[in-house]
Every structure is written in C-alpha cells, then in structure tokens.
Amino acid sequence: MAGVDFRQFRYFIAVAEELHFGRAAERLHIAQSGLSQQILKLERSVDAQLLRRDRRGVQLTEAGRLFLEQARQAVELADRAMASPRLAQRGKRGLLRVGTTILSIPPIAGRVVQAFEERYPDVEIELHPRIITELIDGISSFALDVAIVVAPYKSVDPPPRYQQLGTYELVVAIPEGHRLAKLERVPRSELLKETFIEGPRSINPEMFDHLHRILFGEIEPPSRLEVADVEEARRLQHVAEGKGIGLAGTPPGVEHQALPGVVFRPLDEDTPPIGYGVVWSATQTSPFLDSFIEIAREVAVSEGTLQPA
C-alpha cells in the first residue's frame, strides 16, 4: 500500500457499520457517488474485496471483517497522535473522550466526570453529547473511549461492554389540572385515551420499541404527537402547554424535579426499570479507560445506585 488515507478508513468504517451506502453517505455528509469511489480506491489499495454488493444490499467479506477491526484501531491511534501535541502544550498527559446522551442524561454522569478530573487532573476529558445511536457508533468506531448511556441501545457487532450504574423508574408526565393528575397512580389503559408526546423513533429505536411494549403492549397509541426535541426538558414543555401526556425517568425513591405546569404520577402496575451505565469497546486501548470505569463504579456505590461487588 503506497500510503495510508485515514479518510478512506473512516469511510469504510461508516459503510461497514451501516451496511448501506446511502445511510453511510448521509452520516458522513458526503455524496454517495463519492463515497463509492473512495471505497473502490481503498479496495484497490489493499488488493482485496472488502464489501460484497448485491441486490440484497451490502455485506462485509471475510477480508472486510478483519480489516474493519484493524481500521478502527488505526483511526483511534491516529486521532490520539494528532491530539498529543495539543495536550502536551496544555500540560496534559492524555485525553479521554467521553460520550453522554442528550436524550436523558443520567444524573450520575456529571459526578463521575468530576470525580475522574479530581483524581487525574493531568488527563483532559473531552465530552461529546450525542443521541444514543451516535454514541454506540462512536464506541464501535473508536471515535469515543467510553460513553454514559441509557439502555437499551442498538446492537452492533461486536457488542460493547456494559456496566450498569443504576436505574430509572418510569413516571407519567401530566399537564397540571388534567383529569389524570387527580389520580395517585395512572392505569396503563388510560394512556391509550390521551395524546402521547414522544420524540422520533430514529433517535433510539430499541428504547422507543421497549417503552411502547411496556406501556401499550402490542397496541399502538391511537393519538401521538411526535416532537423533534430530543431533550426530556423540552418534551415536557409540550406537556406543560397541555398538548398531551408524556413519559419521564426518575431515580428510585426520588421525586422528579418540579416543572411548572407538569405533575408526575407513577403507573398503577409495576414496570421494569430502565438501566443506565457506561459502555466501551472490548478492544479499546485508552490507558485511562479502566480508571474511568472504576471511578464510575465507586460513585454509583457511594450514591447507593449500585451494590458493592
């Protein structure tokens, strides 16, 4: 191979993860034709077919699967090398790239980051707030070292490792003065009689489907209001305006933070909690990863959301 083009590596990783040139091109913000040309150039450079294209779509060849793992690690090392002079100028000896979900940020996230910074002041924390699908892609492609997420999340191959730190309990968000606000607990059957406010399924399809199964079983809510807002606080503002009811998560035994115009009520039946924790790649090479995970466990144990090992 005459030279290494890490841009082509990134292009290949995107196609390998999406298994679809159109979605990969959209993710990379480039034209699909240009992406196809770059992948062909890469295959000529390595003298191997990495992708199998047919009417059914795109599949990785055996050579492609082997190359994907190496390409991810190469891109990660290149990114670290490019960052090292900048870090050295600031007196830092390393960088840890931490992803956080913008959909529903676990309350523990900020405290874990703060505890790590206090113990390792010479390591720079780089925060990347993203939607959950982008976080898992970032872990798989080594663009992120670790992420604090709400589960469940999309499955990838190989699957990331996961350490649960705590759980959320689901509560119903109701406009103040609404008939359901008079109840101590809300029957699930009542949810089907109201307009249900939620974000787009594309943000986290696995979580979206999981919550629908919990709340509605196999029945689709007859009236939905899909809003573009991915942050819980913004979605709850639609509830406060009386447009419908919604869903929120709160740590067990903790009342949800008050919001003008909104009241929170538990469901009348026990519902499975929603877990949150840290995810990382089994082949991640960051020298600070293990320390971050250990600190995350310590913080969770100290706050009572995780039982000591």
Where are these regions (language model features)?
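Secondary-structure junction motif
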Residues: P107, E184-R188, E194-I219, T250, ...
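Beta-alpha-beta core module
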Residues: V156-Q163, Y168, A233-T283
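A short LG(V/I)-centered, amphipathic sequence patch enriched
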Residues: E43-L60, R65
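A late-sequence structural motif
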Residues: I108, V262-L306
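Hydrophobic hinge/microswitch elements
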Residues: I131-L144, V150, P200-V263
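Central regulatory/effector-binding core of bacterial HTH transcription factors
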Residues: R93-S155
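Flexible hinge/capping segments at coil-to-helix
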Residues: R161-L170, I174-F196, S281, D290
